[in-house]
Amino acid sequence: MPTGFVAPILCVLLPSPTREAATVASATGDSASERESAAPAAAPTAEAPPPSVVTRPEPQALPSPAIRAPLPDLYPFGTMRGGGFGDRDRDRDRGGFGARGGGGLPPKKFGNPGERLRKKKWDLSELPKFEKNFYVEHPEVARLTPYEVDELRRKKEITVRGGDVCPKPVFAFHHANFPQYVMDVLMDQHFTEPTPIQCQGFPLALSGRDMVGIAQTGSGKTLAYLLPAIVHINHQPYLERGDGPICLVLAPTRELAQQVQQVADDYGKCSRLKSTCIYGGAPKGPQIRDLERGVEICIATPGRLIDFLESGKTNLRRCTYLVLDEADRMLDMGFEPQIRKIVDQIRPDRQTLMWSATWPKEVRQLAEDFLRDYTQINVGNLELSANHNILQIVDVCMESEKDHKLIQLMEEIMAEKENKTIIFVETKRRCDDLTRRMRRDGWPAMCIHGDKSQPERDWVLNEFRSGKAPILIATDVASRGLDVEDVKFVINYDYPNSSEDYVHRIGRTARSTNKGTAYTFFTPGNLKQARELIKVLEEANQAINPKLMQLVDHRGGGGGGGGRSRYRTTSSANNPNLMYQDECDRRLRGVKDGGRRDSASYRDRSETDRAGYANGSGYGSPNSAFGAQAGQYTYGQGTYGAAAYGTSSYTAQEYGAGTYGASSTTSTGRSSQSSSQQFSGIGRSGQQPQPLMSQQFAQPPGATNMIGYMGQTAYQYPPPPPPPPPSRK
């Protein structure tokens, strides 16, 4: 090429340093002196001096033009990006395989998150005053006597500790004197009365008091702090340009933060309150734009909020209402240093509300450091407790038996009309492997864990909520904060490392006042957690698997295999453990012992039969035969055998009138035993059989058996057929 063409080509290819620096400076709002210092950085040469450091009242990171912005990820569902769970993957938006000029060095990071944030020295005399007590006691509440207050708290299992004088609890939403637009949304969502944590939490939060709320999962804690926050914000001056949020909610995971933001949007839009949700794993641009426009409510995970505070994208000067949601979970995830850095940026006379499901010493220490003269509200037992609306079934098995038992259990669950199920596993690899195996066998399963990109996690949760994929396999990233109302089953494929995680896992079902069932596979390798699990079961009045008791008594000797015969040699009358054991065996033994399941997999059925199977309408069409011979085990006909089974000694009449009792057809077309006959072989003659599971709380009026009260029908399918007669030679 002639040399005369080199210079023009270079002029075209090389961008002007001054223009690029001016573009960056105008986007970041830098001054002229800063643009001059940033100009050499756009096209560095060997002689160029290093950029000068500009001193600001607030530290602000200057973006380097040499580092290119990442392209959008074109394949968000096919790549594994980032590491860790929750918010720890907040640095995913740096250049990687999807960025231009791949292989470039990532931007320089400081050693610890929040290292550049300095603790502010507050002078309360110079800070503007603000009001935080807006509670006006309703006349109906004011007329309550001390005795009636104590009875109301006892009935709702509310315990109040600390503080000078605690307001009386409310027992209706209008007692809290919320604005009419808030009451309208409550009525639209068909809320009739506040939950126990809301009964005492509303008066405390509206009074401007610091408080700690300890309650089980799904107890309505989100509304307990968001509705008072709306009242608090509406009594503050309007935001001005450059102001940060008035209400800050810290949450441990992205999923919980998004759910809180959805609730805040539902209740705040009528009063034109703006809210935003900032979390890692998502693009920073939209989140920064929301903060720059001004939001009254900010729901954030600690890591991403630290990033924005360090870079000067937001500030907490106007924050007067601080909420720490799932405080115990944030400490478990190692966010305590970030939380302390964030709280140091907020004025000390703020109102602080801390919410947790457990009360370990780490959470107590955090409350002592952040809260002033606080009142503690406990709903239920202060000890670790599970939701009493959850039926807990523990199956003691070996590690190698889990897959087989899981498939048998899923065959039973998928026959239910409401069959949304969450399966919890311990590791990300097992989560992917189990999902791959189940999908290969035709199960509509999807998975979620910390290595999934945020778009994929959102997509999976939407598919799960809509019912298109009723099986969700997850790690502990979803064990807290995931709020899906109609989850009916939770399966602990792997038992968690602590009883606290167990309680939060099974708490994904039976949200609010619903019922649910939790299955747990417990292996001898989980022996260290056995005693704590038994305490949780006893506190919830659940029957305890005798294998689990034997595992504790014998320190895991034999894996619980020998205890079976020991318990079965005793009388089965009035033995709740035996009835529990029989029910677990009947549910989980499957085809091998002649159970209620056919050998065909969910994926092997035709579209018509599969739809009927998923809708709980039986096994395919009403006239389809179940077994090798037509009419042998005909479902949907009202009896368990239209023809004789085997020889003449096993006739249909003898079977219907024998030990198994007569059967009746339910509305769904499935055959089930009546409650008076299902235990005909258990108990003493002339004595009313005990309800299955022997739950020790009051049975509702009109209920004929307790298992129906706990969310399951007594027997959804007919009993197994009798064994064939011995062959005669």
From Swiss-Prot:
Cross-link (Glycyl lysine isopeptide (Lys-Gly) (interchain with G-Cter in SUMO1)): 129
Transactivation domain, as annotated region: 547-729
Gene Ontology biological process terms from the UniProt entry: alternative mRNA splicing, via spliceosome; androgen receptor signaling pathway; defense response to virus; epithelial to mesenchymal transition; estrogen receptor signaling pathway; immune system process; miRNA metabolic process; myoblast differentiation
Compositionally biased residues, Pro residues: 717-729
Binding-site positions, ATP: 215-222
Cross-link (Glycyl lysine isopeptide (Lys-Gly) (interchain with G-Cter in SUMO2)): 129, 528
Outcome reported for the amino acid change (mutating residue 221 to N): No effect on transcription activation, when assayed in luciferase reporter gene assays using MDM2 or FOS promoters, either alone or in the presence of EP300 and KAT2B
Motif (DEAD box): 325-328
Subunit organization: Interacts with DDX5 in an RNA-independent manner. Interacts with CDK9 transcription elongation complex under basal conditions. Following cell stimulation with poly(I:C), a synthetic double-stranded RNA mimicking viral infection, the interaction with CDK9 is decreased. Interacts with ESR1 in an estrogen-independent manner. Interacts with HNRNPH1; this interaction is important for the regulation of alternative splicing on G-quadruplex structures.
Role this protein plays: As an RNA helicase, unwinds RNA and alters RNA structures through ATP binding and hydrolysis. Involved in multiple cellular processes, including pre-mRNA splicing, alternative splicing, ribosomal RNA processing and miRNA processing, as well as transcription regulation. Regulates the alternative splicing of exons exhibiting specific features. For instance, promotes the inclusion of AC-rich alternative exons in CD44 transcripts. This function requires the RNA helicase activity. Affects NFAT5 and histone macro-H2A.1/MACROH2A1 alternative splicing in a CDK9-dependent manner.
Name of the protein described by the UniProt record: Probable ATP-dependent RNA helicase DDX17
Species: Homo sapiens (Human)
Lineage: Eukaryota, Metazoa, Chordata, Craniata, Vertebrata
